[in-house]
Amino acid sequence: MFLYIFVFTILIGIYLLTARIGGCSDKWFFAIVMCVALFVGLSDMLGGYDRYIYAEFFDQVADVSMTVSPDYLHECGIFRQWPGEKGFGWLNVLISFLTSNRYIFILILTVIIYVLLYISIRQYAKNNILALIVFMGIMFFFTFTYLRQMLGISIAWLGIRYIYDRSFWKFVLIILIAFSMHNSALVLFPIYFIPPKRYTINSVLVILSVCLFLGILGVSSFLYDSYGDAFDTERIDILTGSDGGIRFGYFVEAAFFAYIILQNYEVVPDTKKDNVLLNVSLLFCAILLLFIRSENGGRLSWYYAIGVVATLSNIAVYRSQTGQGFTMRMNTFMSYHAFLILLSFFLYFRILRGWGEGGYQILYPYKTFLTNGHRVPDRTFDEYEYDYKYDRDKLYR
């Protein structure tokens, strides 16, 4: 656990060293993001059973690639498992020409995700390191396990710029590519048709209240059933599965983020870009409330998380430009950025601790695939390992 805390602490240190100049240069920031990517990508099947599922499908694709006349669509289970998401299947095929090893495959996928994240933060955030810290609190740990959806999300985030640039077909192209990786990317499509303007606080509160009301009524299952062509039955059951109760965590997260944003509403400049990011962040809150009775429906809000990452970090920059005199501006800046860092750490630590409970300890102790063997105990390995040759030699393929 302490290694993860150390990683977060290092990012805080970098931020404190670069805060006065607005973050790192693009080159240094890229290097930092790649270090985070390697930390995730080199880990030895950490994050849960999803990695084993993707790894087994990839190994099958790699085996087919070695045949004389590969027939991927009929011989590879990945195309039958996700028939509507062939983009991910063909990406597996492409990577199989580079490696047949599942660990290298996961590393390549992770690097792709973080390269796309780097591009998004560079485009949308005023302070790249602070934005990365906020990302760490909200989404970092999901890059360990939800590889396919995170790939779709990181691609979809590239389309945000085409909303405020009003480039419809470029936006559609990005969404279609993301959709081919994970069909849930379709949830980002409606944002293009929301005018890129500032809405009144009262209007925002009304919309959030309506989403909360609909969420309490359990409307999410109905919405998914209406889009049966876009989401397979299994995904509907997973994402809209309800235990019959309200997920209080969704409400707290949505209410807290909405409160911070609305408290600083006037601080954010009234530009197309800032308004789009602002609206995206508020829609993140709205989706959490809409799926407040859903076991995993909150995962749809991840497509809007870049709005929260950019807006919250940008507010810190904008607050430093307000007030009378340098001292007041710096006090305003320091108080908010300290609060934002503490909030990000709380969210980060909450997931870190939560994913270590229940006997699985899917994140720690940390281990890379650079050494053979597996962690003991490791219930995920015991239940989902499909090829024990990897345990004896990580690079045997």
State each model region's role.
Residues 1-397:
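Terminal, non-globular segments
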